[in-house]
């Protein structure tokens, strides 16, 4: 009786211990360490941990609400797996362990959990593959210079040897790996990996679009926000040029392609007008002060009276008419108020001086503004400080004196080059050629066309687009810059609109994304058979169409808060 009671007490203690071990996530069999090691996929031999088996089963089961296991069921199933593993010859491998887990789940009628476990295992295999590939990529990016690593040289606009350039590549390469495994359909990812197609800017696949034509006239009116602060409407050509750079930079940070201005001359003309107006009245006050021996305060008061009576809308084009108004107004104003006599001829002389001085000062300010713009677009940072903005400017058709002055000085600044005389890479410049505007001798902007040719011969920019080409002329309406086809930095054009032909305009348009097809490979595979060639081409076109629509669906899900400048200010 004593021996039996002692045995029962010993048995109960052992069961209690086993229960406590199971509650802690362990098993009685694990404590006995009957399996000491496993062989990982890498071939490394590591210590065996039964808790990982239990954890994997638990995580798979939590995905299936209809097959939720109790703790006891989970422990029992883990024990069955361990028992089966003990019967295997030699040290079990990771693959063998996973096969046994699947087998035991199916035998216990946990089919859905088994399927979830298989998916869980597949995900981890992908992660392991991705980790191995990325670690190698990161190692090269971190420790090898660009001359030894192609990845660091694939984008000439990124200095991947710098800290920010390397950081940008970290994000780029990990994003591409993630999209390949979890976002892009497998057959499309494989086609890209094999070189049948090339998905451009794949690192931004689920994030943004390519490029945009920015209407600076619309943007600058009443000011705008970059997403980090609100900017007032510019009132000087220097401010116009500076904010043009900021607009390009802000949009570059929200898109993966280059940014273009389709109406640069029209937009800058407004800044030239404002600068001319300020310089005109400043020069007029200076002339009145000196010529008529007035105090600075009296000259300022008289200038204010002139502005109130005649308005401030004086431009290079209307300066002559304004001079005639001043000639009639000033003698009468002085006489009516009992002030110093100023004759009509003296008033006109004041206006002529103001116009001449304002033109000279505005021209100098415009050159400085364009010089600063060229330097800024080759030095200011975008995208985490790793690039300069990929910028393009379209111009050449604004025949106003102000627009012509802006283009003339941009060409002068481009000819002068950067600080050491080097040719500026940015902005890409496109001169829009149009008969009746600038193409033929006698056209109002013909001199600008000749200047552009001289500049291009020296500095490679501007390039030239021809608005009289049939595929461009069909959209053109005289005097409407929104109907003038403009080009992106990548030389693409977006103008047509098959959905609504009343909206075939330039401003605000852009590209969503690009994918290239490997035509030489198709030609080689066709072996001279045109029927086979077009059959293969049709297959690749269908695949690319599927891919572009897949990417478009992701892009359509984006919100304004994803693009505070592009959509918030557009």
Language-model region placement:
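Intrinsically disordered, low-complexity segments enriched in serine/proline and basic residues
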Residues: 14-21
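Intrinsic-disorder-associated, low-complexity terminal segments enriched in Asp/Asn/His/Tyr and depleted
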Residues: 2, 7-11
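Short regulatory "switch" loops immediately downstream of catalytic or recognition motifs
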Residues: 1-3, 20, 61-62, 273-277
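Conserved catalytic cores of very large enzyme subunits
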Residues: 123-127, 133-570
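Charged, amphipathic alpha-helical regulatory modules used
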Residues: 8, 30-144
């Amino acid at each position: 009786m004593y021996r039996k009671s002692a045995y029962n007490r010993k048995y109960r203690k052992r069961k209690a211990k086993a229960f406590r071990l199971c509650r802690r996530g362990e098993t009685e069999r694990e404590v006995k360490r009957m399996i000491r090691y496993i062989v990982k996929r890498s071939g490394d031999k590591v210590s065996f941990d039964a808790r990982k088996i239990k954890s994997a089963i638990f995580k798979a089961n939590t995905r299936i609400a209809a097959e939720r296991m109790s703790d006891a069921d989970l422990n029992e199933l883990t024990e069955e797996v361990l028992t089966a593993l003990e019967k295997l010859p030699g040290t079990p491998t990771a693959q063998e362990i996973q096969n046994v887990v699947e087998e035991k789940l199916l035998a216990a009628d946990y089919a859905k959990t088994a399927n979830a476990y298989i998916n869980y295992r597949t995900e981890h295999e992908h992660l392991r593959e991705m980790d191995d590939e990325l670690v190698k990529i990161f190692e090269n990016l971190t420790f090898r210079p660009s001359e030894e690593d192609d990845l660091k040289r694939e984008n000439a606009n990124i200095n991947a040897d710098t800290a920010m350039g390397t950081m940008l590549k970290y994000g780029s390469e990990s994003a591409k790996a993630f999209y390949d495994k979890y976002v892009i359909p497998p057959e499309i990812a494989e086609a890209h990996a094999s070189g049948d197609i090339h998905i451009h800017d794949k690192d931004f696949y689920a994030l943004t679009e390519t490029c945009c034509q920015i209407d600076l006239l619309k943007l600058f009116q009443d000011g705008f926000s970059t997403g980090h602060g609100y900017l007032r409407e510019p009132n000087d050509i220097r401010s116009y040029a500076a904010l043009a750079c900021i607009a390009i930079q802000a949009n570059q940070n929200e898109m993966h392609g280059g940014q273009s201005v389709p109406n640069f001359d029209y937009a800058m003309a407004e800044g030239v007008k404002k600068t001319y107006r300020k310089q005109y009245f400043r020069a007029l006050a200076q002339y009145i002060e000196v010529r008529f021996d007035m105090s600075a305060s009296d000259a300022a008061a008289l200038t204010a009276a002139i502005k109130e009576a005649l308005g401030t809308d004086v431009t290079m084009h209307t300066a002559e008419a304004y001079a005639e108004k001043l000639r009639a107004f000033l003698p009468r104003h002085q006489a009516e108020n009992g002030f110093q006599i100023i004759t009509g001829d003296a008033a006109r002389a004041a206006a002529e001086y103001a116009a001449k001085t304002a033109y000279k000062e505005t021209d100098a300010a415009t050159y400085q503004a364009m010089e600063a713009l060229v330097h800024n677009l080759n030095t200011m940072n975008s995208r985490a400080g790793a690039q300069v903005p990929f910028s393009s400017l379209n111009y050449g058709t604004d025949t106003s004196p102000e627009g012509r002055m802006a283009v003339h000085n941009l060409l002068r600044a481009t000819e002068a080059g950067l600080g050491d005389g080097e040719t500026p890479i940015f902005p890409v410049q496109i001169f829009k050629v149009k008969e009746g505007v600038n193409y033929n001798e006698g056209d109002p902007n013909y001199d600008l066309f000749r200047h552009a040719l001289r500049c291009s011969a020296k500095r490679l920019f501007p390039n030239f687009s021809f608005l009289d080409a049939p595929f461009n002329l069909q959209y053109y309406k005289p005097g409407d810059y929104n109907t003038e086809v403009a080009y992106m930095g990548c030389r693409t054009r977006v103008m047509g609109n098959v959905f609504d032909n009343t909206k075939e305009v330039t401003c605000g348009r852009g590209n969503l994304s690009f994918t290239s097809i490997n035509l030489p490979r198709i030609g080689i595979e066709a072996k001279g058979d045109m029927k086979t060639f077009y059959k293969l081409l049709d297959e690749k076109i269908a695949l690319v169409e599927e891919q572009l629509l897949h990417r478009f669906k992701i892009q359509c899900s984006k919100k304004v808060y994803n693009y505070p400048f592009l959509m918030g200010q557009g």
